[in-house]
Amino acid sequence: MALVDENGKIINKEIVNYEDEKSEKFILEKINEYVARNSQGVNAIGIGVPGIIKNNKIIYTCNISLVDSYFIRKIRTKIPVYLANDALCATLAEYQLIDNCKYDNYALMTIGTGIGAGLIFNKQVYEGRSGYAGEVGHMVIRKNGLQCNCGRRGCFEKYASVSRLLQIAKVNTLKEFFNLVESNKYVASIFNYYLDDLAEGMANFIMVNDVDMLVIGGSLAWFGDKFYYILRAKIAEKLFNREAKDVKMKFAKLGNDAGLIGAAFLSEWLNQKNKED
């Protein structure tokens, strides 16, 4: 949680460990406590949620128990509250602060505990008719594959999330994993197969969305310099035309703060979108 000014500068930030407690009650309690301490002079509150959001309502979440159409009514404040997918929040921060809104069509794919994406088409936020746009983590890449928390089988994030990579390699952190890649042939082979699956999903995403710039975010982006060219080559192998193969692609710059900063921008972007609609 953070207090952010209109320029995207973080004034203060608090980190809450919710790994062992992901209930709505706990999350609301922490939000309300933070709002009570930091609401003076605040014009809007933005919240990023790892799930499907439509019209400021939580439609579905996969990895936390937070399905509540009236969630924002339980936040004790008179300040306007805006909800959006957490990947979309990160997208807005990178698009506005790093890329200065210069691309017409833009996407950021977050690769961490799960996989999600935020989309900007014609310089406008795109959530889709029902809020499902960007739910790339639940795109099936293996028919009858691994069971996903969403109820489907073979979902992209079951093969290409950071959680899956660490699980297969039997390590706790990406830092530990990449320390082993160069010296351990078994771990190197795991990473090669992992990049195949990551490239599969990313190639599908590129073909469907045809954006001007694709940014890779999430914890995997911190180590991007170790595999960027290998990943690009694997993606190119799965695409059939030159234009798709030449898509601009890079790693996010804002790290863990991207979602916080982007959430602070939600009121501006969503109000603009509503005016256009």
Task: List each model region and its residues.
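Glycine-rich phosphate-binding/hydrolytic loop that grips phosphoryl groups
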Residues: 4, 85-96, 222-277
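Glycine-rich phosphate-binding loop and adjoining helix at the ATP-binding site
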Residues: 19-32, 36, 41-45, 51-105, ...
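Glycine/GP-enriched mid-protein hinge/lid loop-to-helix segment characteristic of carbohydrate kinases
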Residues: 2-8, 14-15, 23-24, 80-82, ...
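Adenine-nucleotide phosphate-binding core of ATP-dependent small-molecule kinases
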Residues: 14-42, 156-158, 164-232, 247-252, ...
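Short glycine-rich anion-binding loops that position phosphate/pyrophosphate groups of nucleotides
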Residues: 50-52, 112-114, 220
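Hydrophobic "anchor" residues
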Residues: 10, 53, 58, 125-126
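Short, well-ordered beta-strand segments
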Residues: 2, 46-48, 215-217
